[in-house]
């Protein structure tokens, strides 16, 4: 019997492949995206020291109270704007975008566009 790997296993394989090439430095850290069925998370990571510099998610009170349901594109755009504002406040202007093995479409694309709107460059 042939067993088809789940989409998450395939995503993790893609993510490992991408992580070999995408590396966050202190000058240009990595903007990592993780999406679940009901929420979306973003982190700005410096891989040289393995430290998260800034993070934002749709679970935060300011986003959840404004939107209610947070598993949609509108919430992803708000998370992108929030993580960009926090990064700019910490002096981070340029990042490397790590889509986490997800295709650049839907919520991942909206998060990236929201971050660009707020002034983050990648």
UniProtKB/Swiss-Prot annotation:
Q: Where is the signal peptide?
A: none
Q: Which InterPro entries does its entry note?
A: Ribosomal_uL18_bac-type (IPR004389), Ribosomal_uL18_bac/euk (IPR005484)
Q: Which GO terms describe its cellular component?
A: cytosolic large ribosomal subunit
* Annotated SUPFAM superfamilies: Translational machinery components
Example GO biological process: translation
Molecular functions (GO terms): 5S rRNA binding; structural constituent of ribosome
Q: Which HAMAP family match?
A: Ribosomal_uL18_B
Which PANTHER family does the record match to this protein? 39S RIBOSOMAL PROTEIN L18, MITOCHONDRIAL, LARGE RIBOSOMAL SUBUNIT PROTEIN UL18M
Its quaternary structure?
Part of the 50S ribosomal subunit; part of the 5S rRNA/L5/L18/L25 subcomplex. Contacts the 5S and 23S rRNAs.
Which family does this protein fall into?
Belongs to the universal ribosomal protein uL18 family.
Annotated protein name in UniProt: Large ribosomal subunit protein uL18
